[in-house]
Curated annotation (Swiss-Prot):
It is found in: Virion; Host nucleus. The record marks 777 as: Involved in interaction with pre-protein VI. The modification Phosphoserine is found at residue 175. It comes from the Viruses. InterPro entries: Adenovirus_Pll_hexon_C, Adenovirus_Pll_hexon_N, Adenovirus_Pll_hexon_sub2, ADV_hexon, VP_dsDNA_II. Keywords: Acetylation, Capsid protein, Cytoplasmic inwards viral transport, Host nucleus, Host-virus interaction, Late protein, Microtubular inwards viral transport, Phosphoprotein, T=25 icosahedral capsid protein, Virion, Virus entry into host cell. The lineage of its organism: Viruses, Varidnaviria, Bamfordvirae, Preplasmiviricota, Tectiliviricetes. Belongs to the adenoviridae hexon protein family. It comes from Human adenovirus C serotype 5 (HAdV-5). This is Hexon protein. One of its GO terms (molecular function) is structural molecule activity.
Length: 952
């Protein structure tokens, strides 16, 4: 069909090359020729594919793009349907490959959207440092506790308990001139003292700017009243209530004006007030106020047991940043348009015949096929923002931890700001005149008070490298561990729904599960993490890019361009006629949007609204006689357009119950003449939506969808696959290392040495994958060519690994010490929680040494990961020549007769329901026939599985 006669002829549509005479003025052409030896024009003029130069009578065909407005639209709770009328005039051809939907609307990413790690508010504050605060406490609390058992004094105790007094914990960094009942004096205007404006002064960011200013006689600061809830300083925010930045809550005054209620509290030293003298002078004034305190991006990770209200214990609460949660449209807008759904969610029909050219099948693979197609023709690591192309990825250092320790040979010190601290106040002395050993005060030149440090500089040491590595492990791995390894902090309110952000965000894990000494020196992925989706992570660079394309705010007025992916129409040439084209667009936020935590966006308040959907398309820029020739040719049924789906496969999902290890499947008897082989992987039921319904009410997840986007990560859970046809002939014969009819993928015990590459994959399976992906098998082992080794192929994603662990049977002194009783870095880290350090310095009791002279007995563990790819088993489409290979040739399997197929998969048990995803590779072809104007007929062929027909 792709004959030169149907291509635009260069005589009409030419490429401007060296000779630009066809569109440059004759004078300029003459100048160029006369001066080309010493003045080269080269590409100083545009060098595009230009439009036809003659035989064009309308400008419509010459426009770069045309906009079609929908003639009908239907906006429901779950979807938005747009219908267009495509009018293709005489002597024109519409290029469906160029069409895209231009969609405008409003996106609310919900309150769980957080596009960064850490906090934006007081990020440098210690996690447990409180804000300046006040609370009420019994005046004689200590005595009350001591006397609780004394029945005789019970009445007195009750009386004392009611005597609540306000306690203050604060800071006064601002140094003023004087303190009066008007507050802190900050200057003089003429002869009049100027006092701080209490609505915003003293400002918290202003204090002493010199490190040596230690003696402040008149100080001021701000403090939060006891009616403002106590929160850690880390992450706390209060909105400003005046233009000067003051934050006090506004209260209506008697004059009707809104002002903040700021009260001044004066303090003197305890020594000065002990005598109750008449000459008391305040040293500190605190400006107390109520503010609207909130924590937009942090939460409490440690809360002491308290009653209602503020208390001393609340100064010990600890804050933790909310987990980052990027939210964006999916890669290539997966899930936005309906595919593979019942009821033909898409229509392309000629208005003369009204036959729909879009025949959907439940196993169509439109989205996955498009992902693999893009990978085969381009580089998926290059992002294309127009189609939202930014492939889901993960940080390889997070999936597989190469724990090579920390380079911390030299200690890291921190010093006081002045370099010297803890000085002694000394007075200058001199030898007494006339005495051998006598000394006297030297007050002639020197001050009486001189600050001198005796000894070395004071310093604190911190192991920066080890702390950074430990923090990396906790933030990137520990927080993503399965929920069964986490716990809810005591006294912290948390949601009961495990699919919500509130639940995922507040659950914490013991840092010791993933610490810097775990698997030290090994390249190993945590066993618990192998079955956790690595693409649901804040280091998913593609998702982060797509999220940032929309901006960094919760509410987004978006304007996106969405291409058509359905293989039968995405490359179609629409001949003259009038056509109806409509499609459905989902509004289910869990399907349309993707989040890095995978929380249920429906429950967590996300929403999407479409304001308008238009269609943009282009006509081929052909001269009329070229277009009419092309049309006449395509009307002939011998020149029908036919398209192959890139994946060309029928997919089937088989449920695997939790903890099941055996999955048998059967395919009824059929002719296998055009069969190409199998591809399979494993999916989690939770991560797989029901595509047959427009809105799946049980789909409570918004992370990556391997079923649609190719983010497979459970390939390592397969052990064996057995394939048996109902004939006596063994298939695929004896040309492999292992038993016919059975493919062994991995071996835990490998007595014969069949495994490969320092892991537990068999040589046989490695060869089969190299054959299926790169046709490398009989030629030995070598690295495939770079153009074949694509993102979704086997070799690029194959990750073998091994490690040594203690042999608890051979090592006689082995003790199974639980994590509650393991200590390493004791006294320098929190106990079983990401909280303040506690305990004492002591020799570690974990892990056992695997190196050195005292290395204990160990055994080697091996495994592999192979994400993104599909396991493939190739099959010859010439079924006659399959079977056992002998010197006399291969046995015939009688291609004309039908055979039933039985397959048995042996898998690792998982503690949640999963799905076996099997792709039967067929020939998925559509043939498009346009015999008359406004008539479009399609026939779908899917040998040997099913066929669809749009002409009946």
């Amino acid at each position: 069909m792709a004959t030169p006669s149907m291509m635009p002829q260069w005589s009409y549509m030419h490429i401007s090359g060296q000779d630009a005479s066809e569109y440059l003025s004759p004078g300029l052409v003459q100048f160029a020729r006369a001066t080309e030896t010493y003045f080269s024009l080269n590409n100083k003029f545009r060098n595009p594919t230009v439009a036809p130069t003659h035989d064009v009578t309308t400008d419509r065909s010459q426009r770069l793009t045309l906009r079609f407005i929908p003639v009908d639209r239907e906006d429901t709770a779950y979807s938005y349907k747009a219908r267009f009328t495509l009018a293709v005039g005489d002597n024109r051809v519409l290029d469906m490959a160029s069409t895209y939907f231009d969609i405008r609307g409003v996106l609310d990413r919900g309150p769980t959207f957080k596009p960064y790690s850490g906090t934006a508010y007081n990020a440098l504050a210690p996690k447990g440092a409180p804000n300046p605060c006040e609370w009420d406490e019994a005046a004689t609390a200590l005595e009350i506790n001591l006397e609780e058992e004394d029945d005789d004094n019970e009445d007195e105790v009750d009386e004392q308990a009611e005597q609540q007094k306000t306690h203050v914990f604060g800071q006064a960094p601002y140094s003023g001139i004087n303190i009066t009942k008007e507050g802190i004096q900050i200057g003089v205007e003429g002869q009049t003292p100027k006092y701080a404006d209490k609505t915003f002064q003293p400002e918290p960011q202003i204090g002493e700017s010199q490190w040596y200013e230690t003696e402040i006689n008149h100080a001021a600061g701000r403090v939060l009243k006891k009616t403002t809830p106590m929160k850690p300083c880390y992450g706390s925010y209060a909105k400003p209530t005046n233009e000067n930045g003051g934050q006090g809550i506004l209260v209506k005054q008697q004059n009707g004006k809104l002002e903040s209620q700021v009260e001044m509290q004066f303090f003197s030293t305890t020594e000065a007030t002990a005598g109750n003298g008449d000459n008391l002078t305040p040293k500190v004034v605190l400006y107390s106020e109520d503010v609207d305190i909130e924590t937009p991006d942090t939460h409490i990770s440690y809360m002491p047991t308290i009653k209602e209200g503020n208390s001393r214990e609340l100064m010990g609460q600890q804050s933790m940043p909310n987990r980052p949660n990027y939210i964006a449209f999916r890669d290539n807008f997966i899930g936005l348009m309906y595919y593979n759904s019942t009821g033909n969610m898409g229509v392309l029909a000629g208005q003369a015949s009204q036959l729909n050219a879009v025949v959907d099948l439940q196993d169509r693979n439109t989205e996955l096929s498009y992902q693999l197609l893009l990978d085969s023709i381009g580089d998926r690591t290059r992002y294309f923002s127009m189609w939202n192309q930014a492939v889901d990825s993960y940080d390889p250092d997070v999936r597989i931890i190469e724990n090579h320790g920390t380079e911390d040979e030299l200690p890291n010190y921190c010093f006081p700001l002045g370099g010297v601290i803890n000085t002694e106040t000394l007075t200058k002395v001199k030898p007494k005149t006339g005495q051998e050993n006598g000394w006297e005060k030297d007050a002639t030149e020197f001050s009486d008070k001189n600050e001198i440090r005796v000894g070395n500089n004071f310093a604190m040491e911190i192991n920066l490298n080890a702390n950074l590595w430990r923090n990396f492990l906790y933030s990137n791995i520990a927080l993503y561990l399965p929920d069964k390894l986490k716990y809810s902090p005591s006294n912290v309110k948390i949601s009961d729904n495990p699919n919500t952000y509130d639940y995922m965000n507040k659950r914490v894990v013991a840092p010791g599960l993933v610490d810097c000494y775990i698997n030290l020196g090994a390249r190993w992925s945590l066993d618990y993490m192998d079955n956790v989706n690595p693409f649901n992570h804040h280091r998913n660079a593609g998702l982060r890019y797509r999220s940032m394309l929309l901006g960094n705010g919760r509410y987004v007025p978006f304007h996106i361009q969405v291409p058509q992916k359905f293989f039968a129409i995405k490359n179609l040439l629409l001949l003259p006629g009038s056509y109806t084209y409509e499609w459905n667009f989902r509004k289910d936020v869990n399907m349309v949007l993707q989040s890095s935590l995978g929380n249920d966006l429906r429950v967590d308040g996300a929403s999407i609204k479409f304001d308008s959907i238009c269609l943009y398309a282009t006509f081929f820029p052909m001269a009329h006689n070229t277009a009419s020739t092309l049309e006449a040719m395509l009307r002939n049924d011998t020149n029908d357009q036919s398209f192959n789906d890139y994946l060309s496969a029928a997919n089937m999902l088989y449920p695997i119950p939790a903890n099941a290890t055996n999955v048998p499947i059967s395919i009824p008897s059929r002719n296998w003449a055009a069969f190409r082989g199998w591809a399979f992987t494993r999916l989690k039921t939770k991560e797989t939506p029901s595509l047959g319904s427009g809105y799946d009410p049980y789909y409570t997840y918004s992370g990556s969808i391997p079923y649609l986007d190719g983010t497979f990560y459970l390939n390592h859970t397969f052990k064996k696959v057995a394939i048996t046809f109902d004939s006596s002939v063994s298939w695929p014969g004896n040309d492999r290392l292992l038993t016919p009819n059975e493919f062994e993928i991995k071996r835990s015990v490998d007595g014969e040495g069949y495994n490969v590459a320092q892991c537990n994959m068999t040589k046989d399976w490695f060869l089969v994958q190299m054959l299926a992906n790169y046709n490398i098998g009989y030629q030995g082992f070598y690295i495939p060519e770079s153009y074949k080794d694509r993102m979704y192929s086997f070799f690029r994603n194959f990750q073998p690994m091994s490690r040594q662990v203690v042999d608890d049977t051979k090592y006689k002194d082995y003790q199974q010490v639980g994590i509650l009783h393991q200590h390493n870095n004791s006294g320098f880290v929190g106990y079983l929680a990401p909280t303040m350090r506690e305990g004492q310095a002591y020799p570690a009791n974990f892990p056992y040494p695997l190196i050195g002279k005292t290395a204990v007995d160990s055994i080697t563990q091996k495994k592999f990961l192979c994400d993104r790819t599909l396991w493939r088993i190739p099959f010859s489409s010439n079924f006659m020549s399959m079977g056992a290979l002998t010197d006399l040739g291969q046995n015939l399997l009688y291609a004309n007769s039908a055979h039933a197929l039985d397959m048995t998969f042996e898998v690792d048990p998982m503690d949640e329901p999963t799905l076996l995803y099997v792709l039967f590779e067929v020939f998925d072809v559509v043939r498009v026939h346009r015999p008359h104007r406004g008539v479009i007929e399609t026939v779908y062929l899917r040998t040997p599985f099913s066929a669809g027909n749009a002409t009946t």
